[in-house]
C-alpha cells in the first residue's frame, strides 16, 4: 500500500483553498492520503517526529510525505507506484542556486559532491519529507534523532540533509516523483497532452511542489474548474 501524508498546524484562509485543491487532486487519482493537523505552535522537529509515528504504525507500507499547502498531484496512481516502489528511501530535490550551491547551506556542496555525482540541476535535498518504505524511513529518522540534537529553530530540511549526507537514501534528481519550482528557469518545463514535463530530465513528475510563495507559478491549466487534476 502507498500513503501520501501531510502535516500542518493550520488549514484556513488561502491555505485552506490550496490544501483543498491538493486534496481533490489526490482523490481524483484514487491515492490514499492522511493529513495531520497539529494544534501546537509550529516546529519542524514535531513534523519529523510525527513522520516517525506514521511509519512505525505502518512499517510495511510505502509513504510519500509532502507539504500541505503548495503541492499538486498531477500523475496517476500506477505511475506513482512505479516511481516509489523500487526505492527503500528517496528524497525529493531542489534546484541548485545560480552559483551552483545548495540553499540554505552553500558550504556543504562539497559533501554532496562526495556523496553522489550530480546528474541534473535538481541535485540538492528538498525539505518536504522522505519517500519510500516505512521501515527504511523509520530507521533513518531514528538514526538522525540518535546522532544529533534537533536545534531549537532547526528545519527538517537541515535534518534530512544530514541524514542523506551520512549515507541514507538517494535523491530524485530526475524529478520522477516530485518537481520543485523554486529557482525555475525559462525553457525547463512544458505541458504535453495535458501532462507537466521536465524538459531537462524528460520526466513526468507525479507531484508539483511550488515551494511556498511560488504557488502562483503552478500551471493551473492542469486543473479543471472542479479542482481535480486532469486525467
Regions found by a protein language model. Name each.
Residues 60, 85-89, 203-205:
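Short, high-confidence coil segments that cap the C-terminus of an alpha-helix
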Residues 122-229:
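Catalytic core and acceptor-binding pocket of nucleotide-sugar-dependent glycosyltransferases
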Residues 1-62, 86, 135:
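N-terminal anchoring/stem segment of glycosyltransferases
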Residues 12, 17, 23-39, 83, ...:
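The feature represents the membrane-entry module of six-transmembrane cation channels
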Residues 17-28, 103-110, 219-224:
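Short, aromatic/basic amphipathic alpha-helical patches
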Residues 72-116:
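Conserved donor-nucleotide/metal-binding helix-loop-beta segment in metal-dependent transferases, i.e.
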Residues 33-41, 91-95, 152-157, 172-177:
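A generic structural motif
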Residues 40-66, 70-76, 122-125, 155-164:
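A conserved donor-nucleotide-binding helix/loop in the catalytic core
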Amino acid at each position: 500500500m502507498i500513503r501520501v501524508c501531510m502535516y500542518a498546524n493550520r488549514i484556513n484562509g488561502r491555505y485552506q483553498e490550496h490544501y483543498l485543491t491538493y486534496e481533490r487532486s489526490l482523490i481524483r487519482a484514487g491515492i490514499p492520503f492522511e493529513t495531520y493537523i497539529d494544534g501546537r505552535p509550529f516546529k519542524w522537529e514535531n513534523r519529523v517526529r510525527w513522520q516517525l509515528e506514521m511509519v512505525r504504525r505502518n512499517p510495511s507500507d510505502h509513504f510519500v510525505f509532502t507539504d500541505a499547502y503548495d503541492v499538486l498531484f498531477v500523475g496517476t496512481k500506477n505511475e506513482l507506484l512505479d516511481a516509489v516502489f523500487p526505492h527503500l528511501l528517496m528524497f525529493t530535490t531542489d534546484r541548485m542556486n545560480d552559483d551552483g550551491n545548495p540553499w540554505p547551506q552553500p558550504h556543504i556542496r562539497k559533501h554532496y559532491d562526495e556523496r553522489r555525482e550530480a546528474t541534473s540541476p535538481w541535485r540538492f535535498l528538498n525539505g518536504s519529507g522522505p519517500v519510500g518504505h516505512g521501515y527504511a524511513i523509520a530507521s533513518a529518522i531514528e538514526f538522525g534523532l540518535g546522532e544529533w540534537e534537533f536545534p531549537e529553530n532547526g528545519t527538517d530540511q537541515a535534518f534530512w540533509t544530514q541524514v542523506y549526507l551520512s549515507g541514507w537514501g538517494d535523491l530524485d534528481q530526475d524529478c520522477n516523483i516530485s518537481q520543485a519550482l523554486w529557482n525555475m528557469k525559462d525553457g525547463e518545463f512544458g505541458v504535453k497532452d495535458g501532462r507537466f514535463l521536465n524538459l531537462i530530465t524528460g520526466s513526468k513528475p507525479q507531484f508539483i511542489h511550488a515551494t511556498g510563495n511560488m504557488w502562483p507559478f503552478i500551471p493551473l491549466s492542469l486543473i479543471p474548474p472542479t479542482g481535480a487534476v486532469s486525467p
